[in-house]
């Protein structure tokens, strides 16, 4: 492991963030710290994860939601101090790592099947 990777690992350990396991297709609620003037508040952003980029400290993910009939995508840095918490609402069953094709779909066609736990027996 080179020096830069080692420094990134130390920084990730220092941040000590509790990040749940999530993947493309999952519906997540991202709580973002928003500063308006002197006030600070938490803003919830709920949508489907359409991409995840794992690059150590520079990891990020894209969340897509439909707001007022218009598709809105937002990219979040995984270890950003503005991202307070990530909560997985629903697990999606998809066969792709990047779900960019959802940009062209609307309504029922854009639904994602729920991943059910494996049956025992």
UniProtKB/Swiss-Prot annotation:
Gene Ontology MF, one: structural constituent of ribosome
Keyword entries, A-Z: Ribonucleoprotein, Ribosomal protein
InterPro entries referenced in this protein's UniProt entry, alphabetically: Ribosomal_bL19, Ribosomal_bL19_CS, Ribosomal_bL19_sf, Translation_prot_SH3-like_sf
Presence of the UniProt keyword Ribonucleoprotein in the record: yes
One GO term of the biological process aspect: translation
Pfam families: Ribosomal_L19 (PF01245)
Family matches, as SUPFAM superfamilies: Translation proteins SH3-like domain
GO cellular component terms, A-Z: cytosolic large ribosomal subunit
Family: Belongs to the bacterial ribosomal protein bL19 family.
Purpose of the protein: This protein is located at the 30S-50S ribosomal subunit interface and may play a role in the structure and function of the aminoacyl-tRNA binding site.
Protein name: Large ribosomal subunit protein bL19
